């Protein structure tokens, strides 16, 4: 939930369609699990042993995390908009 990806037209309440896979390319939008806890949908960019989680809304900060802290759940394919 939230509007961190509004710049990619992914709105609060949309249902994301995710293809389960752990591989990705930089700048793909992926579903990520952070610290075996929270799930988020962000663009990702890999830098050696760091990963940047990049929102498409400039009002949200980029999170830079050690790669071991995240699990790539899958790649974003599209969405279903309710309403």
Where are these regions (language model features)?
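Acidic/glycine-rich C-terminal interaction modules and beta/coil loop segments
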Residues: 1-83
């Amino acid at each position: 939930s939230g509007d961190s990806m509004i710049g990619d037209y992914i709105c609060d309440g949309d249902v994301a369609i995710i293809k389960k896979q752990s591989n990705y390319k930089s700048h793909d939008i992926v579903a990520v699990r952070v610290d075996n806890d929270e799930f988020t949908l962000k663009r990702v960019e890999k830098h050696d042993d760091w990963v940047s989680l990049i929102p498409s809304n400039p009002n949200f900060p980029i999170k830079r995390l050690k790669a071991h802290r995240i699990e790539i759940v899958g790649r974003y394919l599209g969405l279903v908009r309710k309403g």
